[in-house]
Regions:
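Conserved active-site and cofactor/substrate-binding residues in soluble primary-metabolism enzymes
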Residues: 40, 44, 82, 125
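Short amphipathic alpha-helices within nucleic acid-binding modules
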Residues: 83-89
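Residues that cap or initiate secondary-structure elements
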Residues: 34, 81-83, 123
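Compact, glycine-rich, soluble single-domain proteins
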Residues: 46, 51-82, 93
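Glycine- and Gly-Pro-enriched alpha-helical subdomains that act as flexible
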Residues: 19-59
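N-terminal accessory/pre-domain segments preceding catalytic cores
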Residues: 1-23
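Short basic, glycine-rich beta-strand/loop surfaces that mediate nucleic-acid
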Residues: 2-7, 28-29, 68-79, 92-137
């Protein structure tokens, strides 16, 4: 999908096959083992949010529309690298979209380090089952 098509889809009137009263969110889970600074976490979370939005627009546009029209809720949580990888496996088995962000290694942390995984956008209940036990960032 080109940039022009993507922008048009974001600004066009929305139609959705999903339940109108359903609530959707995007969950960003930070690799807390890396001890990143606040700015680094913000930048990596931004990368994850944008990447998840673009990926969802290409694969499940109706779900993206539902999330965009329901307020674009985002939640930032933290966990260890080991648990983050386990959550990713569970999400894939459940059909929840995931997006990995690996750092380029130009500032605080080694190149290739897994900094954050975005889960969703998906219905709140699905993500709550997966990540509800994690602590807020």
């Amino acid at each position: 999908m080109g940039l022009r098509s993507f922008i048009h889809r974001l600004s066009a009137p929305k139609t959705s096959d999903f339940v109108p009263n359903a609530s959707f969110k995007l969950v960003l889970v930070i690799n807390h083992d890396l001890k990143m600074g606040k700015g680094k976490i913000a930048a990596q979370s931004g990368h994850a949010s944008v990447s998840a939005t673009v990926k969802m627009g290409a694969s499940k546009p109706n779900l993206l529309d539902a999330w965009l029209t329901s307020g674009q809720k985002k939640v930032c949580l933290k966990t260890t690298l080991d648990e983050l990888l386990e959550l990713e496996k569970e999400a894939v088995k459940s059909g929840i979209q995931t997006v990995r962000i690996n750092d380029a290694g130009k500032t605080q942390i080694p190149s290739g380090s897994l900094t954050v995984i975005a889960f969703g956008p998906a219905q709140d209940g699905e993500l709550e089952q997966l990540t509800g036990h994690l602590k807020l960032l």
